[in-house]
A protein has these predicted regions:
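A positively charged, amphipathic N-terminal helix/segment that binds anionic biomolecules
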Residues: 1-235, 239-246, 255
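Non-catalytic regulatory/linker segments of enzymes
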Residues: 218, 228-236, 258-260, 268-273, ...
Length: 281
């Protein structure tokens, strides 16, 4: 490649040198500009700037769809967790309940195998403790960050108690029809989630909901600063609080999980009315 403009375009994507199987789009207007595999073997993408606007609209749609489906999801999860046997549906529902309550990552087998980082489906029993009426999680998350989460949801506490009785090191396992112990996978949980919700959503959408809710709550408590710089600082502080909940960097949290409408509403001084309309979700 010798064309100076093309070289500048490729360099601007800042694809890490460690990525393998990297491919670039020949068309500078194509929505997907680059794709490659990270050290864990996962595909990573670089998109055109205009495509990011489309993704933001889709994020808003998925968030609204999840909020609408929440009552149905909660009823189905409660029904499946009402049993006393560690069935497949019981274990899958328990993972959904955990992520909905704590917003931890779903889990990736490659990351667990390569560097011992954990998410919901790859948690070990040693990462999960019952402390009175609470479930306490302690594990190393993506990026090596030490995470500690505590949840007092009665359904989850009861489910963890039942699942701990299943032989094996993994936390979320079940016995199949033949009595064989099997660990759940993130793909299985996502499929189960779509089945009970009746819509196309994923576990990641719960993290978007949590991040947006934290930012909404944080910004609804403050009056927008008079200067643009001051407002940016207020937004950053709110995003940092959400990033802590998600064990993410503020930059990733803002880009991938926080709904732009919340920030815009805050900057325009109408967040109090916006917050009132979604109170209770």
């Amino acid at each position: 490649i010798r064309h100076a403009g093309t070289i500048r375009r490729l360099n601007s994507m800042a694809v890490p040198p460690a990525y393998a199987e990297v491919r670039y789009a020949t068309d500078p207007t194509f929505h997907l500009q680059a794709v490659g595999r990270d050290a864990a073997g996962r595909l990573q993408y670089r998109y055109h700037a205009d495509w990011e606007k489309v993704r933001e609209r889709r994020k808003a749609h998925r968030l609204a769809t999840l909020v609408e489906a929440l009552p149905k999801i909660r009823r189905a999860v409660s029904q499946h967790l009402s049993g006393d046997e560690p069935t497949r549906e019981f274990a899958l529902a328990a993972v959904i309940e955990l992520i909905a309550r704590t917003a931890i990552r779903p889990g990736n087998e490659s990351y667990a195998r390569l560097n011992g980082t954990r998410g919901a489906t790859t948690l070990l029993k040693s990462n999960v403790a019952l402390d009175g009426d609470s479930v306490v999680l302690t594990f190393k998350a993506k990026g090596g960050k030490a995470v500690r989460k505590e949840c007092g949801a009665a359904k989850l506490v009861r489910a963890i108690g039942i699942l701990r009785g299943v032989p094996g090191k993994r936390m979320f396992q079940y016995r199949d029809a033949n009595g064989i112990v099997r660990a759940v996978s993130t793909a299985q949980v996502n499929t189960f989630l779509r089945e009970i919700a009746g819509i196309k959503i994923s576990l990641k959408d719960f993290r978007t909901l949590m991040a947006s809710a934290v930012v909404l709550e944080s910004l609804s408590r403050v009056t927008p600063a008079t200067s643009e710089r001051g407002r940016r600082k207020q937004v950053l502080e709110a995003v940092r609080a959400a990033a802590d909940e998600l064990s993410n960097t503020p930059a990733i949290c803002r880009k991938s999980y926080v709904h732009d409408t919340i920030v815009t509403a805050f900057e325009d001084g109408i967040l109090e009315r916006f917050a009132a309309t979604v109170k209770g979700y």
